[in-house]
Amino acid sequence: MKVRHVMGMSLAGVFLLAISLAAANTDVADAAMRKDRAALQALLQKGANVNAAQADGARAIHWAVYNGDLEMTKMLIGAGADVKVANRDGSTPLWLASTNGDAAIIRVLLDAGANANEVLPLGRTPLMLASRTGALDAMRVLIDRGANLNARDSERGTTPMMWAADQGHAAAVRLLVERGADLAARSAPAARGRGPALGKSNDPRASVKRQVEAVIAEQGQLPDLSQLRAAGNNNGGGARGNANANAANNNDGDDQADAAAAFGGGGGRGRQAQTDGGQLTPLIYAARANSLETVRVLLDAGADINQVSGYGWSPLLVATQNRFYLLGKYLLERGANVNLANKGGWTPLYLATDNRNIEGGDYPVRPTDMDDLEYIKLLLAKGADVNARMIDSSETRTVFTNQWLDERGATAFLRASQSGDLQLMKLLLEHGADPKITTDLKVTALQVAAGIGWVEGITSERSKEETLEAVRLLLDLGLDPNAQALTGRVALHGAGHKGATEVVKLLVSRGAKMDVRDWGNTDNRGSPELAAHTWLPVDYADGLVRVGVQSAIAHPETGRVFRELMKQAGLDPPAEGRTLDSICIVEICSIDYKPN
């Protein structure tokens, strides 16, 4: 026992000694970290290990370079410091010097054997880091020592020029141009997959969608409602029949609702593709950075002003999307194509219209650097196509709006109508806008002006008064107040949902029918019966119809006006005070059915 006790004490002593020696080994790095040149010199004179690492792998040379201490760096190199060593994160002394843009230390490190083309984590190079910093002298040293001007990182395939352009370092970009860097280089394609495609499935709704697309291919337009009715299996149930909660077993025979669902559920859906696509160029990076001077350098050097990214983002689209209107103006003056759209069909005119009436909720909104209406006038003066139609929903549309307003096929005029932007609507009309162009789901400008797609607290509206006048304008232009979208909704459904009482009165006075039902709302979950129920405009006003994830909001005054107008029209209005929890709605009521 005695011997074992002594051995235990000896082992403990060895362990403590090892800890003490390990701690002592960091003294050189610690002194450099403290910027204590005298202590460091004393340690080196005693033969301390110049390459001893701290816990994170940092050596004295890392700290000297990081602190920008040229004399300490030279001292450590003279004592044998490894200029190529990396810490645990992969940072080398040259990485740190390049990030700092320290030309003098970069030169010393290269003289001591560092590699100007060393590959750092994620494939980055010292020249990329110096370019991001915009340090011209540091860049020159690296380039003079053979740094690859067109090296690409392994994460996004970006080059030094892209790093400089992204930070708006015009002088750094000019230097790279002068040294022969590739102006037309592109970053790698986006690694993320595209969104869900609307393809074949076992859902009968997909079959309906294919039938609709066949008509589009043959006739160049969507089928009218009579064609969709004829496509049904005539089981008599329609949207009020026995709906199955499982869409794959949907045999309700209501192909109108199925067509709407195939094109996006309750009338809306999110974007169908990722909107970056990768393949950005230095010019697109410069536009995204709102660096007019960098854009100027690249254009003067011969960059194509209409080059596009993988998704089709041109410099003008990027500038417009980000509200950099002065840059957009400059690009237009240099000859940018005002009608060049990306894969979503988004044009500068549509994006500027959307920006003027931006939704709240999902995106922080920067102020424009130029009056938005003046910018739109500039686009129009350059020949913007006022009737260009969207292919995909815009990037700023919130999930709430996407769930019941599908922007495919929309024009800038329809988008302006959604926000009751009377001034812009009139401007677009003056330039040839066709007010009767609908979305692919047959949603009209009148419907969105009345409230289809309205989300409380999200949708932008110029004013209630202006919206009323916008609705009046659309009626005067001949838009049909009883036109139904492929969801079955009419303008009155939107006005009821929004609680736009004066709009309701105006629409009814111009012939809007109050007994028109939609074709069922897939967003009323609760029960299959409720999901299949069809709704009157007054039901929307009573807050019985939920659209997407937004809550249904009751508008008692609008409901009261609906009932008065229905009585005047000889219609039997539903009882007041209805709620889904307390009453049984006639069409879905049965003896043994009790709403949840």
Predicted regions and their residues:
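Ankyrin repeat start-site detector
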Residues: 56, 88-89, 121-122, 155-156, ...
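Bacterial N-terminal signal peptides
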Residues: 9-20
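Ankyrin repeat domain, specifically the short helix-to-loop turn at the C-terminus of the second helix
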Residues: 44-49, 74-82, 107-115, 140-148, ...
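Conserved ankyrin/ankyrin-like repeat signature
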Residues: 39, 71-72, 104-105, 137-138, ...
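Disordered, low-complexity segments in secreted/periplasmic proteins that are enriched in proline
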Residues: 192-274, 581-596
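Ankyrin repeat A-helix N-terminal signature
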Residues: 30-34, 63-69, 96-102, 129-135, ...
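Ankyrin repeat boundary signal
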Residues: 52-53, 83-86, 116-119, 149-153, ...
